[in-house]
Amino acid sequence: MKRVKILSLTIAVFCFFISFVEFNFSSVFAMPFYDFQPKEIVLRAEFYTSYPSSTDERKTNIMLAAKSLDNILIVPNEEFSFNKTVGERTEKRGYKSAKIIVNGEFVDGVGGGVCQVSTTLYNALLLAGLKIIEYHPHSLPVSYVAPSFDAMVNSGWADLRFINDTHNPVILRTFADGSILKVQVYGEPLKEKFIRKSVITGEIPAPEYEILTDTLREFSDLYEGDMKIISYSKAGYKSEGYLIKTVSGKVISSTKIRSDSYSAVRGKIIKGTIPRVKEPLIDSTLITVYRIKRKI
């Protein structure tokens, strides 16, 4: 993969140069030879998700990952790896702590929010008709995309990978402005159009709340007898994802591309432990005597 600086000029020169030279440059310049079939480079597909209510830390992580995915060129038959392209999500590289999913719970972790970038890319790739060879669902439903269309990643084992199975380069453009995240896929023109369809096939009831006690008194306004919801119980889902192919508005095929199960989320309620300050009782007879004496 290569980073493109000037999109249209680079592609035009690159395709022309590679396609019309009559000998293999690999023997001269030690670089691979690609048998491109130059065509007009167009916007094949785009997809966007939103994140206006995210924390500043999560927004930072999204923007860092999006920047790593912008102006990326993938030549024919080349494999793309999200993790290799974006790199490790560490504090040293500027990533912040935000909510991630671990063992079926939302917890704080460095790089929280990057999965929204991989998910947005995943959907753009589907709409662009490219060959996805690795993706992973979340264990819990996420709010920024329909069930069966998410793509979880982490720096360890979970990646998002696809192959450019077209005859020409594919270029990724990625934009994040603090509210909207958009991925565009450029390449040779598509004859068909793809539509996503998410189908809920079953629902997992939301569990009862877990009751916790604020023994460390982390909530300064939570007194004995008070209770506060710190996370909501949510239902889980069983779902299927379909990719519908159309040509000139006519449905050609509808293919089930995946089936998923998302666990229900158990919410948490915390009970206060701070003692209430009792107001001193005042004898009403004393007040009456005091008033009488003042009148005298």
Language model feature labels by segment:
Residues F25-I296:
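Well-ordered beta-sheet/strand-loop patches within structured domains
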Residues M1-R3:
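N-terminal secretory signal peptides that target proteins for export/translocation
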Residues I6-F23:
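Sec-dependent N-terminal signal peptides of Gram-positive bacterial secreted proteins and lipoproteins
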